[in-house]
């Protein structure tokens, strides 16, 4: 039955039960309502507790600083917690601040917030009261209905049965208790609706009867369909059995054939397996024999292992002893290396001191050389005066030649001879120290002819060819000879007391014999190993002389390159060059004899200042790097900077990449060298001192370039004007 609030309330017992069960049913209905009221009370109490906790949480949110009270601005922090605007939150704060002091304590906030919340929820509480009242009325109504059902009479039961029989409801309704209960309730409470209810039952029962008839018809049709389906299925089963039987016979036939073929195949396999078994048996016997032999070998190996372990222990002890000895030897070797290093340093210092002393001695000798040149000039003047006096005496003393007496005195020939000796000695000094004499050496490196004083014409001495020699190499040459050497015939030993005959003087004066430039005494051993290059050109003096300086890092192959170029041979294991060394090589360049003075410089850092001094007088520079050493190529720019600082860009530079024969270990590609040469306007070649590849070609290219450059300079000089002839130092 529907309750006044729209809810459907189920009855506690079904219709048709005894009337004595009515009080139990009403009690069952009252008990849940009482429990519902208690539950609502508990829910209300728990809601109040939840609100108190929520109010405390809101207070803590507002009082983030822990002051113990909240102000009006702190109330705005609840904007994210509650669906209220800032103005509404301020209104709530004003409502909670009853005393108007501008802040709220925890007690005021909790009490006021709870009161505010419950005041907002009063309408819902009133609705809950109305629901409780409705539930009470429903409870009373249900209890009364149960009492009325208990007082139903037998006549009403008979009338209900007659109605059901008239309608034929027994065939349709299985349980009439619910309909009976509704009919009795309508008859007692609202009898005017009873006829409508009976009409409703009549229509319902007639519809149910029609539905029952349709159901029976459908069941009959379904049974007929099932029978036809069963017959068809039976027919299909029979056909399938026939097919299965035929297929089974065919399968058995094929299976028999397969079985026979399989049997034959298995028999053959069995024979093969038996043969394999025999082979395996034989192999097993053979393996057993090998296993037995291996066991014997194992025992022997164990014995050998035992011996080897003992031997290994002995060797380990010997190794340990050897290692101790090796450590001692290494310590001794380190001490020897340290001593060798000290000796090397001392040797270098000694070499430096000797070199410095040589420089000082060189300066002293240069001063002596200047003095001797002045003396030579004075002697030439005296010789001219003697010539004039002799001519006058010849005219005055022609009558008294027979009575000419012999006298002793100085003869100009003595001075001339001594001057030749002095000149020879000065030239020897220049050979030792590698100092070119600008007044007596030509472009080719050979001395010019002797000139008469003041005229610039060649003297009677003629040319004095002398091959160029290289400077001292401190590493290769012993130095004590320099300290022991000296002049064999100093100026003070020139004799002036020789007597000559009358006729001898007359013969000497008009003829003016040539000056003797060869020293009267043999020379001492020159300092250093002065190796000469093979002269490939004609014995005549070269037309040009160019000074070329080799630079580059140590061990790039400069000395080996020079030896290959000059001597056409390669000497492995050469030591590094110390100081400066040079060689001379004459080439035929375009039908012209060109002498190349090749200066080999040391690549070590400590000789850098010495190397830079030779750039100033160089006609060309060759910068060499190692193709197998990238660091030597990286140092090329530094060498080019040194050359540019010393001579600028007026000197042509040849960039050589050595060790082309060692192509497998190449670290510098050819493209990098070509790029560097293009950027700095250099001549670029890759060569090999070991095989001689591009050694002559590269220097021939540089010599031709220097010759063309000098020809260009000469042509420009001729166009400007002929320069005045240089006077000799003695003129």
Curated annotation (Swiss-Prot):
PROSITE patterns: EF_HAND_1 (PS00018), EF_HAND_2 (PS50222), RAB (PS51419). A lipid is attached at residue 729 (S-geranylgeranyl cysteine). InterPro entries: EF-hand-dom_pair, EF_Hand_1_Ca_BS, EF_hand_dom, P-loop_NTPase, Rab, Small_GTP-bd, Small_GTPase. SMART domains: ARF (SM00177), EFh (SM00054), RAB (SM00175), RAN (SM00176), RAS (SM00173), RHO (SM00174). Mg(2+) binds at residues 559, 577, 600. Its cofactor is Mg(2+). This is EF-hand calcium-binding domain-containing protein 4B. The lineage of its organism: Eukaryota, Metazoa, Chordata, Craniata, Vertebrata. The gene is CRACR2A.
């Amino acid at each position: 039955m529907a309750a006044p609030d729209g809810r459907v309330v189920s009855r506690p017992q079904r219709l048709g039960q005894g009337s004595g069960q009515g009080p139990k049913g009403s009690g069952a209905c009252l008990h849940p309502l009482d429990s519902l009221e208690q539950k609502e009370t508990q829910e209300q109490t728990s809601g109040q507790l939840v609100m108190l906790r929520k109010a405390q949480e809101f207070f803590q949110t507002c009082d983030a600083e822990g002051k113990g009270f909240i102000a009006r601005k702190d109330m705005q922090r609840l904007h994210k917690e509650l669906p209220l605007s800032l103005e509404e939150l301020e209104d709530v704060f004003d409502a909670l601040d009853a005393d108007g002091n501008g802040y709220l304590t925890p007690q005021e906030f909790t009490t006021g917030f709870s009161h505010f919340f419950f005041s907002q929820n009063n309408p819902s509480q009133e609705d809950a009261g109305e629901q409780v009242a409705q539930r009470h009325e429903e409870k009373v109504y249900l209890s009364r209905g149960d009492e009325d059902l208990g007082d139903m009479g037998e006549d009403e039961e008979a009338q209900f049965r007659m109605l059901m029989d008239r309608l034929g409801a027994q065939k349709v309704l299985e349980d009439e208790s619910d309909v009976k209960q509704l009919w009795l309730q309508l008859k007692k409470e609202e009898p005017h609706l009873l006829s409508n209810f009976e009409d409703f039952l009549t229509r319902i029962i007639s519809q149910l009867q029609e539905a029952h008839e349709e159901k029976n018809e459908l069941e009959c049709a379904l049974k007929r369909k099932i029978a036809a389906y069963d017959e068809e299925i039976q027919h299909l089963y029979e056909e399938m059995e026939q097919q299965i039987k035929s297929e089974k016979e065919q399968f058995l036939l094929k299976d028999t054939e397969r079985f026979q073929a399989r049997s034959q195949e298995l028999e053959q396999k069995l024979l093969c397996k038996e043969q394999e078994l025999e082979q395996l048996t034989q192999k097993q016997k053979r393996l057993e024999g090998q296993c037995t032999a291996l066991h014997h070998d194992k025992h022997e190996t164990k014995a050998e292992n035992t011996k080897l372990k003992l031997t290994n222990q002995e060797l380990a002890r010997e190794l340990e002893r050897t290692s101790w000895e090796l450590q001692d030897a290494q310590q001794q070797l380190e001490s020897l290396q340290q001593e060798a290093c000290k000796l090397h340093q001392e040797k270098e210092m000694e070499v430096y001191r000797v070199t410095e002393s040589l420089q000082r001695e060189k300066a002293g000798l240069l001063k002596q050389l200047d003095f001797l040149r002045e003396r030579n000039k004075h002697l030439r003047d005296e010789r001219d005066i003697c010539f004039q006096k002799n001519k006058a005496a010849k005219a005055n003393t022609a009558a008294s030649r027979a009575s000419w007496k012999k006298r002793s005195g100085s003869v100009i020939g003595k001075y001339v001879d001594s001057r030749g000796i002095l000149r020879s000695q000065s030239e020897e000094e220049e050979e030792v120290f590698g100092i070119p004499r600008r007044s007596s050496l030509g472009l080719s490196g050979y001395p010019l002819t002797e000139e008469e004083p003041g005229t610039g014409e060649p003297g009677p001495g003629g040319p004095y060819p002398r091959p160029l020699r290289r400077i001292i190499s401190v590493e290769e040459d012993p130095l004590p000879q320099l300290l022991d050497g000296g002049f064999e015939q100093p100026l003070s030993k020139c004799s002036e007391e020789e007597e000559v005959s009358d006729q001898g003087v007359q013969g000497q004066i008009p003829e003016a014999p040539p000056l003797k430039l060869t020293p009267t005494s043999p020379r001492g051993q020159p300092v250093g190993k002065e190796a000469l290059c093979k002269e490939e050109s004609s014995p005549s003096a070269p037309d040009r002389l160019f000074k070329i300086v080799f630079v580059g890092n140590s061990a790039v192959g400069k000395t080996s390159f020079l030896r290959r170029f000059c001597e056409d041979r390669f000497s492995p294991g050469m030591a590094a060059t110390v100081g400066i060394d040079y060689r001379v090589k004459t080439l035929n360049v375009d039908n012209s004899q060109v002498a190349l003075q090749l200066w080999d410089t040391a690549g070590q850092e400590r000789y850098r200042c010495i190397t830079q001094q030779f750039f100033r007088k160089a006609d060309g520079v060759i910068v060499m790097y190692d193709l197998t050493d990238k660091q030597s190529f990286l140092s090329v720019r530094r060498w080019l900077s040194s050359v540019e600082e010393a001579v600028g860009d007026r000197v042509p530079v040849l960039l050589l990449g050595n060790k082309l024969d060692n192509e497998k270990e190449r670290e510098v590609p050819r493209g990098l060298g070509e790029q560097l040469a293009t950027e700095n306007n250099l001549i670029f070649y890759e060569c090999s001192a070991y095989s001689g590849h591009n050694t002559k070609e590269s220097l021939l290219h540089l010599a031709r370039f220097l010759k063309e450059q000098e020809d260009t300079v000469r042509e420009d000089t001729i166009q400007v004007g002929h320069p005045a002839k240089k006077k000799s130092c003695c003129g």
